[in-house]
A protein has these predicted regions:
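Divalent metal-dependent hydrolysis catalytic cores, especially in the metallo-beta-lactamase
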Residues: 2-9, 175-179
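Short, conserved phosphate-binding/catalytic loop or strand-edge motifs used
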Residues: 9-21
């Protein structure tokens, strides 16, 4: 389609050294350093004609489970999230970040903020399937108007939430623009 796109930078914040995925892939455990290095990476690849997709919104590095194999939420309060992951993503949005990759990470405190009557299922729905996280928080509160792609759709944190036939339309309704990986093209497109 005439563009190069990188699923990077990883802007997760390493707040749990036992996290098997993020502890070796993040810039730092420091918010400001994560933002500074992510901004420089973003500027550099954009100058080279590559579109960045910061990941994994709303932020990994808190829990010690791996979304490839299990469900793993981000347990931060709204205030703590705003001061950490919200600060990093907000800074990238201000600098013109064109896309993000939504992670299969629940953000229950923000779901409660948007819907105090949320069910347990809604509280722990992965961001890729949550209207509260992608539409209300990302697009509404944070005013992000770029492209949203899901993380890999075969990861257990997503597949354990619902049947695949429900998952695709739910991801689109939640606010995802692109779905990463298909199972059976005929099944998925129907």
């Amino acid at each position: 389609i005439g563009c190069n796109w990188s699923f990077a930078p990883i802007v997760d914040i390493n707040r749990n050294w036992r996290n098997p995925i993020i502890s070796t892939r993040t810039w730092s455990q420091d918010v400001e350093q994560t933002l500074e290095l992510s901004l420089e990476y973003m500027r550099g690849i954009m100058e080279s004609g590559i579109a960045p997709a910061a990941k994994h919104f709303p932020g990994d590095g808190i829990d010690e489970r791996d979304q490839h194999l299990s469900f793993a939420p981000n347990w931060l309060s709204c205030e703590d999230w705003d001061a950490t992951f919200g600060r990093v993503y907000g800074g990238l949005f201000e600098a013109g970040l064109p896309s993000i990759m939504a992670g299969h990470i629940a953000l229950p405190e923000y779901v409660k903020y948007f819907n105090p009557e949320a069910t347990t299922e809604e509280l722990y729905m992965p961001a890729t399937l949550s209207k509260y996280i992608l539409t209300d928080l990302l697009r509404g509160e944070m005013k992000f108007n770029g492209l949203v792609v899901t993380d890999a759709s075969h990861m257990v944190a997503m597949t354990s939430a619902m049947k695949r036939s429900e998952m695709l339309p739910t991801a689109i309704a939640a606010g995802c623009d692109l779905f990463l990986f298909f199972n059976d093209p005929e099944e998925d497109f129907n």
